[in-house]
């Protein structure tokens, strides 16, 4: 009887582990690059940390259904707290928010006012500390 329970438990744990690995967020797309001029653009709100609150509200409304409230990614959406994301310039993140990447499920937010997109970038910078790179 104990062997059957152990076997059943092992099978259940294996299925859970396999399912969990299939649900990992995508790695950032290294071919989705902002043009140099866009990447070099500084965040005009960088010295106004109080505006991050607006970015947090926008993130909850527009982004959390895919990236989660903490930005760690749900399903195939990338972890926005990761080193690979956080190492990108503010201008690059702004460009990606603006243009999107429909091949990867990221919509364009070009219709969102520019300052609100910059607030989102500022909020991304306030997410939990990024994981260390390789």
PLM regions: where:
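Hydrophobic h-region of N-terminal signal peptides that target proteins for export
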Residues: 13-20
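Gly/Gly-Pro-rich "capping" loops immediately C-terminal to redox-active cysteine motifs
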Residues: 52-56, 68, 72-98
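The canonical Cys-X-X-Cys-His
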Residues: 55, 59-69, 120-124
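Conserved beta-strand positions that form and line the central face of beta-propeller blades
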Residues: 44, 79, 105-108
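Bacterial N-terminal signal peptides that target proteins for export
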Residues: 2-9
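C-terminal capping alpha-helices of c-type cytochrome domains
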Residues: 109-134
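Electrostatic cytochrome c docking/interface patches
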Residues: 27-58, 129, 134
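Boundary at the C-terminal end of the N-terminal hydrophobic targeting segment
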Residues: 20-22, 38
């Amino acid at each position: 009887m104990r062997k059957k329970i152990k076997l059943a438990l092992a099978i259940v744990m294996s299925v859970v582990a396999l399912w969990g690995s299939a649900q990992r967020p995508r790695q950032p797309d290294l071919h989705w690059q902002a043009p140099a001029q866009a990447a070099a653009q500084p965040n005009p709100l960088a010295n106004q940390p109080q505006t991050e609150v607006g970015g947090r509200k926008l993130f909850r409304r527009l982004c959390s259904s895919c990236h989660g409230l903490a930005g760690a990614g749900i399903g195939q959406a990338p972890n926005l707290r990761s080193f690979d994301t956080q190492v990108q310039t503010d201008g690059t993140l702004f460009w990606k928010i603006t243009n999107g990447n429909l091949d990867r499920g990221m919509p364009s937010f070009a219709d969102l006012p520019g300052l609100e997109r910059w607030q989102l970038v500022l909020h991304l910078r306030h997410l939990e500390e990024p994981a260390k790179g390789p």
